[in-house]
Amino acid sequence: MPSLRDIRTRIGSVRSTRQITKAMKMVSAAKLRRAQDAVLKTRPYAMLLDQTLSRLAARAAAEEQVAHPLLAPRAQRTAEVVVVTSDRGLAGGFNSNICRFVQRFLTENADRFERIALATVGKKGREYFKARNLPIRRDYTGIHANLAYEKAEALAREATERYLAGEVDAVFLAYNEFKSAISQKQAVVQLLPVDTSAASADTAGVDFRYEPSREALLADLLPRHVAMQVWRALLESAASEHGARMSAMESATKNAEEMIASLSLQYNRARQAYVTKELSEIVSGAEAL
């Protein structure tokens, strides 16, 4: 049976842990609010950009015009999956869920492509796939440290250049899509070639006057679209990470409080037993006299 000193030490240790998890929960809650605001502000712009591109591509296809290289379909032999994870842990199943989701995607598409490589954003994804001897072509570091649109733009530019050079035939983006503070949905979306199949059925029947031209707009908007897809994935992942960490720390804090209550009860019982024993010894000694 542990001594009173041992129990007191454990209670102090658990209390220190509770202070840490409670502080981390509060920090994550503050970061979540900012990240959630950024996601909600980005979604309408991304959706409108998708609709505009779909309309432009649909009209170009209807008039049998030459499509932009980022739209033109081609034989897909090689692919790359850009996996967005976090640099830090203590976020529940946030990282493991998306990594396992990507593993299933690789298995399901093994016959579709001759070769599928990985590019990781975040230390946890790199560690996960490296431990399983999966090929990692590129590890993007320092993106989460100071999240900025310019970093997403640089990543998108590199992916676009490799696609146009024929080094890869398809690029996918895997990330946790933010639903709520306690819910994230794993997603793998096609980044390149740009998918405009979301165009509505009556899009081809509606046209606008474009200046300077439809082709010039496509050439300008397509790179923006790719960069926006990457930026949105980074923001969605950041919000999901903070939500997952907040939930994990809330659960850890609750468990710590329950453990403190259990240890306190154990301490009181042990102390009561110790006092009873001391009293019994005193009474026995008095009777002996």
Curated annotation (Swiss-Prot):
GO terms for cellular component: plasma membrane; proton-transporting ATP synthase complex. It is found in: Cell inner membrane. GO terms for molecular function: ATP binding; proton-transporting ATP synthase activity, rotational mechanism. Keywords: ATP synthesis, Cell inner membrane, Cell membrane, CF(1), Hydrogen ion transport, Ion transport, Membrane, Transport. InterPro entries: ATP_synth_F1_ATPase_gsu (IPR035968), ATP_synth_F1_gsu (IPR000131), ATP_synth_F1_gsu_CS (IPR023632). It is a peripheral membrane protein. CDD domains: F1-ATPase_gamma (cd12151). PROSITE patterns: ATPASE_GAMMA. Gene3D superfamilies: 3.40.1380.10, ATP synthase, gamma subunit, helix hairpin domain. It comes from the Bacteria. Its main location: membrane. It holds the Pfam family ATP-synt. One of its GO terms (biological process) is proton motive force-driven plasma membrane ATP synthesis. NCBIfam families: ATPsyn_F1gamma. Produces ATP from ADP in the presence of a proton gradient across the membrane. The gamma chain is believed to be important in regulating ATPase activity and the flow of protons through the CF(0) complex. F-type ATPases have 2 components, CF(1) - the catalytic core - and CF(0) - the membrane proton channel. CF(1) has five subunits: alpha(3), beta(3), gamma(1), delta(1), epsilon(1). CF(0) has three main subunits: a, b and c. Belongs to the ATPase gamma chain family. This is ATP synthase gamma chain. It comes from Anaeromyxobacter dehalogenans (strain 2CP-C). The lineage of its organism: Bacteria, Pseudomonadati, Myxococcota, Myxococcia, Myxococcales. The gene is atpG.
